[in-house]
From Swiss-Prot:
S-adenosyl-L-methionine-dependent methyltransferase that catalyzes the trimethylation of the amino group of the modified target histidine residue in translation elongation factor 2 (EF-2), to form an intermediate called diphthine. The three successive methylation reactions represent the second step of diphthamide biosynthesis. It comes from Saccharolobus solfataricus (strain ATCC 35092 / DSM 1617 / JCM 11322 / P2). It catalyses: 2-[(3S)-amino-3-carboxypropyl]-L-histidyl-[translation elongation factor 2] + 3 S-adenosyl-L-methionine = diphthine-[translation elongation factor 2] + 3 S-adenosyl-L-homocysteine + 3 H(+). This is Diphthine synthase. Keywords: Methyltransferase, S-adenosyl-L-methionine, Transferase.
Length: 257
């Protein structure tokens, strides 16, 4: 019986836990998930320096983690202990639970090492109430002329219930979507559907390079945000719902002057 570990690395190097390093050190194969999310300063070379000793490192894209997961199960069946190391938390906004289920069905031991995710970090930094967040959603790059309306519809549903929406931004072929690009996509959807989900005068919150020394978190109007320089990626956005008076007061501390 082998061990499959899902290891959350946190959102930057300073949030990698001792438990994460210990688990990786006890693995024969470390699969670094570079598809699900990005960090401002964690990459496979950082893991090589943190984890001592000889072992195999694999940089995994979507094809391995979702479409060819049998290869990971095969490693376990051959007696190798395998860790999948993910930015943030290994099970928040990922599909890795399917691997745990399959490994368990085949008689292997499974472990989960939680990490600080951008989801909880952003909520804390935004000063908004954690109880008032609805479903999160990813804004994806357009495909030819097709723009996926899912984020627009999720924001609409959340706003109708007075809830805030966290928008994850797409990562495709090593290119991370910027907050500016995401907002332009949403405004195009607003032009098409005209359901008053997002207006240029709405206040939003944008986080950039969260967890790193140069992180930024700014509240500003959509019309300002579309051309604002948020710096290097990764970026993430909150579309607020109805603000409690304490939230409205607190948000002033991060409001762009």
């Amino acid at each position: 019986m082998s061990i499959l570990s899902l290891v959350g690395l946190g959102i930057s190097k300073k949030f990698i836990t001792d438990s994460a390093i210990e688990t990786l050190s006890n693995s024969d194969i470390i699969i670094f998930d570079r598809y699900t999310s990005r960090s401002c300063d964690i990459n496979v070379d950082v893991l090589r320096r943190l984890v001592k000793g000889e072992r195999e490192f694999i940089e995994a894209d979507r094809s391995l983690l979702e479409n060819n997961s049998k290869a990971i199960i095969d490693y376990l069946d051959k007696g190798y202990n395998v860790s999948i190391a993910s930015i943030g938390d290994a099970l928040i906004a990922t599909t890795h639970v399917s691997l745990l289920i399959e490994a368990k069905h085949r008689g292997h031991e499974v472990k989960v090492i939680p990490g600080i995710s951008v989801h909880c970090y952003l909520i804390s930094k935004s000063l908004l109430s954690s109880y008032k967040f609805g479903k999160s959603v990813t804004v994806t790059f357009p495909y030819n002329d097709f723009i996926d309306p899912t984020p627009y519809n999720v924001i609409k549903d959340n706003k109708e219930r007075g809830l805030h929406t966290i928008l994850y931004l797409d990562l495709k072929n090593e290119k991370a979507m910027t907050a500016n690009e995401a907002l332009q996509i949403l405004l195009r959807l607003e032009e098409r559907h005209k359901k008053s989900v997002l207006s240029k005068s709405d206040i939003i919150i944008v986080g950039a390079r969260l967890g790193c020394d140069d992180e930024r978190i700014i509240a500003l109007k959509v019309e300002e945000a579309t051309s604002f320089d948020f710096g290097n990626t990764p970026h993430i956005i909150i579309i607020p719902g109805n603000l409690h008076y304490m939230e409205a007061d607190a948000i002033k501390w991060i409001l762009r002057s």
